Amino acid sequence: MSVLNHKYLDKDIWKKNNVDVPTYDIEHMRSITLKEPTWIHFGAGNIFRLYIAGLQDTLLRKHITDHGIIVGETFDKEIIENIYKVNDQLTLSVIMRNDGTFPLKIIASVADSYSCDSQSTDGYNKFVDYFRQEKLQMVSLTVTEKGYCIKNSKGEYLPEVKKAFLEGPGVSDNIMVNISSLLYERFCAGSLPIAIVSMDNCQANGKVLFESIASIAYNWEKNGVVVTGFTEYLENPCKVAFPWSMIDKITPRPSDKVKTMLEKCGFTGMEPICTSKNTYIAPFVNAEEAQYLVVEDSFPNGRPQLEMAGVIFTDRDTVSKVEAMKVTACLNPLHTALAVFGCMLGYSSIAEEMNNEQLVRLIKKIGYEEALPVVEDPKILNPVTFIDEVIKTRLPNENILDTPQRIATDTSQKIPIRFGNTICRYLSEGKDTDNLEGISIVLAGWMRYLLGKDDNGLTITLSPDPLLEELIPVINRAAQGDVSSMESILRRKDVFGVDLIDAGMGDKVKEIFNKMKAPNGIKKVLSEYMGETE
């Protein structure tokens, strides 16, 4: 029997299975962290538990620091109640290597965790106290791209945000309101310095975060519900910094294969759960071995020595180039392409799709031929080496059972950056967008996906997306030949990042989409454009 509890980490089962357990004093770490916190993190999901918390765990093991991390969760408090608290804040890390080995490690760097929403005022009040502490250096976030939104797709402020504008700082179900409110506490405590670091896959994430926070603060000052000077405090980088970052580590849902392996080793209580918010989570986190975190070195109150754990610190311009390299060329567009076609062709894993020669040709065409030529070399990471690793090592990893269905989530929010940026670069550099054949196939493929049918005409379940309700009726009318509906979707800059018709790509995308509507049309399109398989 095994228990994820720091008091039982000397049990024989951990040694027998070569689990790397912490050697530092966990109780001491927790005590001093809660007394004088230096690092708070919001967003208690899997990439934090394994990667980001793992970085601090490395520093603790090397005796570079004696502090841990305090965690907050606004979106899904079941994660805190049913995973963090039940497992004594510990995570069993499982790295799924290509060679089939699965090294195990206990990550123990989380000192405590709290829900922080309108139903969890006690947790919020804990953070009020923590934010008023002088030695707090950084607050990091992994709340997904949606977490930074304070407006809906029509540009209107969300109801909970409008409510906060009138009521002023306080606990909310919107994470941006909560962070703004807690920063106001820090301002009132003496304009104490702090860095607020987005670690989400979101281009210019520091800018996106700042704009949401500043907008809330501006409306508070305008409405007279905060003391004058709060906005000025946020805009002073010597007081509050919003460093940009690029993060990359594939961290899929808990794998049944891993659960079975752990149970055979004698570990109990490893069953994954699905919360009411549709979060898939378990006492363990499985992930690939590759990982990258590049951060703008702007921390007005100091920072952890995360470079000793492999983090790259650099300037903002370099972070931006690395992010663009990954998000618009070397990984994310390839992921989205595989996700869209994987859903329609019946695949259950990305690795399985990498055995499809036509899909591999498609992502190579998008990456090497179409996107890389307009990506700036960031120097600190080589783009060709990076994409080589993605295509040859990372995506084919059969142990990473990442699903097309998971990656297809929120695709409408991803397309403008993952594909729209490349189209914009072609236009600004005077290049012929007619050469963007691979990207056209993916955009048409996504429109075809929204019809909710696979290549055999059978119904498929579409992954969650905030624009589904709005787009599906338009796509269906377009599929039935309604010209105005087709034109309206092709001109959606908010969806594609550009007006596809004005960009010279509308006709090609429409043509490919219409071909894909036919029975087995998707396979036929792939054969036509990517060649027959051997």
Predicted stretch roles:
Residues 1-534:
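Substrate/ligand-engaging "lid" and interaction regions
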